[in-house]
A protein has these predicted regions:
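Transmembrane-helix signature of 12-pass secondary carriers
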Residues: 1-508
Length: 508
C-alpha cells in the first residue's frame, strides 16, 4: 500500500519495528550480513589493489603513466565515493534500500570492470579516471544504502556488534587485495596482471548480486513510507524464515505500537540545516567521530609504505607482508571487541577506543622519534593501535547510522561520510609532505602527535556527547519524523527540538 491523502491524514498503526527487534539471531540474519556486508570488503579490496598496482602502471609495457598520474587514481575514486554516497543516499531514502543495494553493486561492478579494460597509450588515462569515479560512486552508494538496511533489519540487541564487525571487514578486503596483487603481479605478466587484479572485485560482486536479489526490502522503510501491505508481507517473510530454525517466536509487546504518518522527502540543504539546528550535539558528535578517524586512517594507510621504505629501508616488494599484519590488527579489533559496544555500552567503548588509540600513538611517536623502532616493531605498534582504533572507527559509522530519524538515515550517513572523506584526504596529503625524503623524522613525529590529538579529541567528545543507544530500538533512539504524537512529528516544519527516547544529555 502506497501512502494516499487518506492514509497520510489518518496515519498507520504498526508493530513492525517491535516485531523486528524481538527476533532471535537466525540464518536469515547471517545471510543478510554476508550479502550486504560485502560492500566493505570490496572497498578495502579496491583501495589496496589500486595502491599495490600503482608502480606497475608506470611501466612502459602497461599504461606508462607518470607517478603523479598514478597517485591521482585514488583521488578520483574518492571523488566518486563522495558523489555516490550523496546521490545514492538520496535515492535510498526515496526509493528503498533493496532497489539501491542492487543498483550500487551493479555500478561498482561496471566501473571496476571498465578499469581492467582500460586501453593503453594516448589519452586513455581519462577513461581510467572515469572508470574509477564510477566504481567509487558504487561503493559510496553502498555505504549509505547498506548501513541503513543493516541497522533497520538487525534486532536491537545485536545491532552494535554486527554493524561494527561489518564495517571492520574493510580490512578483510584489504588483506585479500594484498594477496591478489602479490599473485597477479608476481606470477602473471605485468601487462595482464594488473588487469586480472582489478577483475577480482567485479567477479565477487556478480556473485553477491544474485544473493541480494532474494533479500526482502526493509519493512521499517516500507512502513515509514506508507506501504503497509508490502511491509506486512516483508516482515511475515522474515518471521517465517526465522521460525523455520528457531521455532515459535517471542511475543510482541503491544505497547510498542507506533502510529505513523508518511512524510515528504527533503533535500540535502534542508537536511543539513535541520541536523545542526535540531540535533546540534548529535551532529557535532557524529561529525567529530567521522572526521577524526578518517584523518588518522587516511594519514597512516596511504603513507605506511613510504614510512617503511624511507625510514626503515624496506623494499617495495616486501611492504605487502608488513601490511598484512596491519590488516590483521584492524580486522581483529571489530570482530573481538565489537560485542562490548552492546554490553558495556556505546559511550564507554567509543570514548575508550578513541582515547586509547590516541595515547598508544603518542607512545609510538616518542619511540619513533627516539629511533627505538625497526620495521617489525613499528608495524607491531601500528597493529596494536589500530586494533582499538578500527573498532572505534567502525563505531563512528554505527553512530551516524542510528542516531537520526529513519526517513533521512541514508542521507545523513552520506553527509557525514562525505565530510569525513574530505577531511581524511587532507591527512594523506599532509603526511606525504611530512615524510619528505625520509632524512628527518621530526616532522613526521609531529604528524603522529597531530593524529593522536585528533583521536583523543574524538574520545573526549564521545565521553560527553555519546548517545547511549545500546539495546534500544531505532525508534527510541530517534523518533521517526512521521510518528503521530511522537517527539519527532513535524521536525521540518515546527522548529522545535526533537530527540527521541534518549535523554538530551546523551546527545540531543
Amino acid at each position: 500500500m502506497v501512502a494516499t491523502p487518506e492514509t497520510a491524514s489518518q496515519g498507520i498503526r504498526s508493530l513492525i519495528p517491535a516485531r523486528i527487534d524481538r527476533l532471535p539471531w537466525s540464518r536469515f540474519h547471517t545471510r543478510l550480513v554476508i550479502a550486504l556486508g560485502v560492500a566493505w570488503v570490496l572497498d578495502g579490496l579496491e583501495i589496496t589493489i589500486a595502491s599495490n598496482v600503482g608502480p606497475t602502471l608506470t611501466q612502459s609495457n602497461t599504461l606508462h603513466m607518470s607517478a603523479s598520474a598514478v597517485a591521482d587514481i585514488a583521488t578520483w575514486y574518492l571523488i566518486g565515493e563522495v558523489f555516490g554516497a550523496l546521490f545514492f543516499g538520496h535515492l535510498s531514502d526515496r526509493l528503498g534500500r533493496k532497489n539501491l543495494f542492487l543498483i550500487t553493486l551493479a555500478v561498482y561492478l561496471a566501473g571496476s570492470a571498465l578499469t581492467a579494460l582500460t586501453p593503453k597509450g594516448g589519452y586513455w588515462f581519462i577513461f581510467l579516471y572515469g572508470s574509477r569515479v564510477i566504481a567509487g560512486m558504487g561503493i559510496g552508494g553502498e555505504y549509505a544504502a547498506i548501513n541503513s538496511a543493516i541497522d533497520e533489519m538487525i534486532p536491537a540487541k545485536y545491532r552494535g556488534r554486527v554493524d561494527i564487525a561489518v564495517n571492520g571487514t574493510y580490512w578483510a578486503g584489504a588483506f585479500l587485495g594484498t594477496i591478489v596483487t602479490l599473485v597477479a603481479l608476481n606470477h602473471i605478466a605485468p601487462a595482464l596482471g594488473w588487469r586480472v587484479a582489478y577483475l577480482v572485485g567485479p567477479v565477487l560482486a556478480l556473485v553477491i548480486i544474485f544473493v541480494r536479489r532474494h533479500l526482502p526490502e526493509s519493512p521499517r522503510w516500507q512502513i515509514m513510507h506508507g506501504r503497509q501491505e508490502q511491509a506486512e508481507g516483508s516482515i511475515a517473510e522474515i518471521e517465517e524464515d526465522v521460525g523455520k530454525t528457531k521455532g515459535e517466536l517471542p511475543p510482541v509487546d503491544p505497547s510498542r505500537e507506533l502510529e505513523i504518518r508518511p512524510t515528504e522527502q527533503i533535500g540535502y540543504v534542508a537536511l543539513l540545516r535541520t541536523l545542526f539546528r535540531h540535533y546540534p550535539s548529535r551532529s557535532i558528535y557524529g561529525a567529530t567521530l567521522m572526521i577524526t578517524q578518517s584523518f588518522l586512517y587516511n594519514a597512516i594507510f596511504f603513507t605506511y609504505g613510504l614510512v617503511l621504505q624511507f625510514f626503515f629501508h624496506v623494499s617495495p616488494g616486501n611492504t605487502p607482508y608488513y601490511f598484512m599484519a596491519f590488516c590483521a590488527g584492524n580486522l581483529l579489533g571489530p570482530l573481538t571487541i565489537g560485542r562490548l559496544f552492546d554490553t558495556i555500552g556505546r559511550r564507554k567503548m567509543i570514548s575508550g577506543t578513541y582515547l586509547l588509540s590516541g595515547i598508544l600513538l603518542i607512545i609510538t611517536a616518542q619511540l619513533f622519534k627516539a629511533g627505538a623502532l625497526n620495521a617489525v616493531t613499528q608495524t607491531l605498534c601500528w597493529t596494536v593501535i589500530f586494533y582499538f582504533a578500527s573498532a572505534g572507527a567502525s563505531a563512528g559509522y554505527l553512530t551516524v547510522s542510528e542516531i537520526f530519524p529513519l526517513e533521512v538515515r541514508a542521507k545523513a550517513i552520506a553527509v557525514f561520510f562525505a565530510i569525513a572523506q574530505c577531511f581524511g584526504s587532507l591527512g594523506s596529503h599532509l603526511y606525504g609532505h611530512l615524510i619528505g625524503d625520509g632524512k628527518d623524522s621530526t616532522a613526521l613525529y609531529w604528524g603522529y602527535m597531530l593524529g593522536a590529538g585528533a583521536m583523543i579529541l574524538g574520545g573526549v567528545v564521545a565521553a560527553f556527547l555519546a548517545v547511549d543507544a545500546e539495546g534500544k530500538s531505532l525508534e527510541d533512539i530517534a523518533k521517526p519524523l512521521g510518528v503521530i504524537g511522537g517527539s519527532a512529528e513535524g521536525i521540518f516544519r515546527s522548529g522545535d527540538p526533537r530527540q527521541g527516547g534518549v535523554s538530551p544529555s546523551a546527545g540531543g
